[in-house]
């Protein structure tokens, strides 16, 4: 019998070769799937980072270092030729608690302040927390008031301060979200000096801060404490501030270790003014510059609204704090030194003849005179490169 010849190459061998190619393809697909899964895992399950990990350019990267496109590590998105979003806190809607006028963002300033906006808050979470004591502090400073101040130049010297006077550290997350409230009327030259000196100090202190100048409209008698209440209410409409520094416009610290932030107890900052021979005039003194946390401020029902004219409201505030079981913390007299810009008494800010009687009744009046009785009307909001000015009608003495 003739034996059948074994199968040689030809059509009968094709099924084995096809199977081999199919197996190779399956292995390649599995390897690709495993690679994509690994990259996805390394990206922290954030698909937006996949192009960076695999070396593909994105519109923000532009084929170069991504830090340059997002303002290095500043947490600010440079928008290039695109029309920028509104500055921080800007809105075309009426401001709550005010009139129907829209919020207006205007004022001169460098273009860099107009073409950059903060990145989403989630980006800041990747930054480390700022240290308890800033390494940028320099200590004692020479404070002089004998040179003119140009606010456009001040803005250029502080390029990281954003429209409306907002700033946050570039390379760490500050635990101190501070609104600085300045009661104001007809003190433009003093405000220039304040902005010139304080913006660098506040940045070296690594604060997340905003500057609010609360301008009393009209020529009725001045009411400092009521303007501070207004500043508290209005600042919270912009940002989740947790600390409030209340500062007269004519006081400048002489040492940047004097922290413009809040502590476990209410803080008196201007403890050694040149006006008083660099000493505390009396133990209960709480005037000039002070800081209260949001909770501390709410606990005392804010500040009194019925102190029209000069004097008395600081002592009323001190009484409120004591009646709520709080004590005053202060820096030492060396760190707490401040200089006052000399000036004559403002018109419509004469001494309040009722102040001593009102101070004597703080315990009875603090429950009904404060945030819960505050009335005012916002007339205008202007956001300048170095500060936000809110002009308000706070009424007249009843």
From Swiss-Prot:
Entry comment describing in which tissues the protein is expressed: Ubiquitously expressed, but at very low levels in fetal and adult brain.
User: Lineage from the top down?
Assistant: Eukaryota, Metazoa, Chordata, Craniata, Vertebrata
EC number per UniProt:
2.4.1.-, 2.4.1.38, 2.4.1.22, 2.4.1.90
Recorded GO cellular component terms are:
azurophil granule membrane; basolateral plasma membrane; brush border membrane; desmosome; external side of plasma membrane; extracellular exosome; extracellular space; filopodium
CDD domains linked to this entry = b4GalT
Q: Where is the composition biased (Polar residues)?
A: 61-76
Disease cited in the entry: Congenital disorder of glycosylation 2D: A multisystem disorder caused by a defect in glycoprotein biosynthesis and characterized by under-glycosylated serum glycoproteins. Congenital disorders of glycosylation result in a wide variety of clinical features, such as defects in the nervous system development, psychomotor retardation, dysmorphic features, hypotonia, coagulation disorders, and immunodeficiency. The broad spectrum of features reflects the critical role of N-glycoproteins during embryonic development, differentiation, and maintenance of cell functions. Combined low LDL and fibrinogen: An autosomal recessive condition characterized by low plasma LDL-cholesterol and fibrinogen levels, and associated with a decreased risk of coronary artery disease.
The UniProt annotation places N-acetyl-D-glucosamine binding at 312-315, 355
> Reaction catalysed?
D-glucose + UDP-alpha-D-galactose = lactose + UDP + H(+); an N-acetyl-beta-D-glucosaminyl derivative + UDP-alpha-D-galactose = a beta-D-galactosyl-(1->4)-N-acetyl-beta-D-glucosaminyl derivative + UDP + H(+); N-acetyl-D-glucosamine + UDP-alpha-D-galactose = beta-D-galactosyl-(1->4)-N-acetyl-D-glucosamine + UDP + H(+); a beta-D-GlcNAc-(1->3)-beta-D-Gal-(1->4)-beta-D-Glc-(1<->1)-Cer(d18:1(4E)) + UDP-alpha-D-galactose = a neolactoside nLc4Cer(d18:1(4E)) + UDP + H(+)
Q: What is this protein called?
A: Beta-1,4-galactosyltransferase 1
- Locate the site labelled Cleavage: 77-78
Its pathway? Answer: Protein modification; protein glycosylation
- Region feature Disordered, mapped onto this chain: 61-117
Tell me which residues bind UDP-alpha-D-galactose. Answer: 183-187, 222-224, 249-250, 310, 343-346
Superkingdom classification of source? Eukaryota
Which residues lie toward the Lumenal compartment?
Answer: 45-398
């Amino acid at each position: 019998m003739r034996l059948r010849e074994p199968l040689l190459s030809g059509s009968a061998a094709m099924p084995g070769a096809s199977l081999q190619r199919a197996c190779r393809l399956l292995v390649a697909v599995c390897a690709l799937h495993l690679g994509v899964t690994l990259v996805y895992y390394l990206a922290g399950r954030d698909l937006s980072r996949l192009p960076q990990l695999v070396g593909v350019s994105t519109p923000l990267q532009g084929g170069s270092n991504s830090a340059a496109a997002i303002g290095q590590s500043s947490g600010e998105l440079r928008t290039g030729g695109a029309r920028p979003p509104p500055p921080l806190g800007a809105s075309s809607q009426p401001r709550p608690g005010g009139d129907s006028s829209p919020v207006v963002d205007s004022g001169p300033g460098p273009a860099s302040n107009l073409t950059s906006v903060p990145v989403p808050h989630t980006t800041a979470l990747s930054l480390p927390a700022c240290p308890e004591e800033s390494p940028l502090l320099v200590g004692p400073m020479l404070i002089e008031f004998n040179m003119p101040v140009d606010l456009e130049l001040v803005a250029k010297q502080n390029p990281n301060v954003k429209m409306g006077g907002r700033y946050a550290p570039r390379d760490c997350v500050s635990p101190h979200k501070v609104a600085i409230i300045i009661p104001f009327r007809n003190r433009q030259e003093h405000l220039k000096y304040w902005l010139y000196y304080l913006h660098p100090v506040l940045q070296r202190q690594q604060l997340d801060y905003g500057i609010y100048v609360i301008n009393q409209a009209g020529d009725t008698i001045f009411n400092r404490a009521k303007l501070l209440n207004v500043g508290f209410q209005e600042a919270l409409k912009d940002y989740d501030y947790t600390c409030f520094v209340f500062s007269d416009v004519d006081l400048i610290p002489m040492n940047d270790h004097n922290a413009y932030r809040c502590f476990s107890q209410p803080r008196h900052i201007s403890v050694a003014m040149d006006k008083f021979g660099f000493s505390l005039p009396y133990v209960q003194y709480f005037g000039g510059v002070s800081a209260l946390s949001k909770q501390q401020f709410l606990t005392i029902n804010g500040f009194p609204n019925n102190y029209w004219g000069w004097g008395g409201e600081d002592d009323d505030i001190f009484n409120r704090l004591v009646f709520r079981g709080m004590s005053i913390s202060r820096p030492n007299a060396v760190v707490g030194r401040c200089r006052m810009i000399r000036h004559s008494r403002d018109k419509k800010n004469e001494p309040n003849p009722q102040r001593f009687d009102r101070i004597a009744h703080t315990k009875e009046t603090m429950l009904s005179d404060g945030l819960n009785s505050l009335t005012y009307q916002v007339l205008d909001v202007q956001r300048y490169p170095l500060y936000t000015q809110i002009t308000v009608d706070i009424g007249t003495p009843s």
